[in-house]
Amino acid sequence: MSKPLRLILFDVDGTLADSQGAITGAMAEAFEGAGLNVPPREAILSIVGLSLPLAMRELAPNHDDATIEALVEGYKSSYMLSRQAAGAAHSPLYPGAREALAQLHEVPEYLLGVATGKSQRGLDALIDAHGLNCFVTRQVADHHPSKPHPSMILTAMAETGADPDSTVMIGDTRFDIEMGRAAGVTTIAVPWGYHDAATLGADYLIRDFAELRPLLAEIWKE
């Protein structure tokens, strides 16, 4: 009898890719371009994972819609230009990420996907830059409400036929974990990203990517 399909969803920024410098740099240029004070680094990292309009409203709560729109467009422009200039070095993969994805991709019943606050263009560029052709479902901010709304995960499950008991969400921020919880799936936190993993309330915590495959086997009792 064939094994049930298992869906493994990853956040991108702060989970698979170290885009901290790229994000804070683009955010600084966006705020400077709008004539505003640049938020502290900690504040910028605290909103990683949210859709850009919501993130900007968190960082600039007292400004009008036109200013928020200018910040969003300024960020997009700066981020795209720096990505085009730097290529894969713009958002390098964390140690062990590529190897973990390759190992999981070899398991016939494992389906890999992403659920990210990045745009479709941004995600496609990162995947192309790193040659990551293992994802069968790619959920991005362009087509969904911002995290922690569960829409991304629910859509990924619908696309793949996986049920909540056969799905995990792996991320580094509270938005990832809250999204997973809202979708009724198992959550796994990583400590190398932008929020304190110990405070996220995830079902599981891994210390490095080498722990992921054994943990999944334990979760699904394989």
Regions inferred by a protein language model and the residue ranges of each:
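Hydrophobic residues in well-ordered beta-strands that form the structural core
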Residues: 18, 114-116, 189
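Well-ordered alpha-helical segments embedded in enzymatic catalytic cores
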Residues: 96-100, 152-155
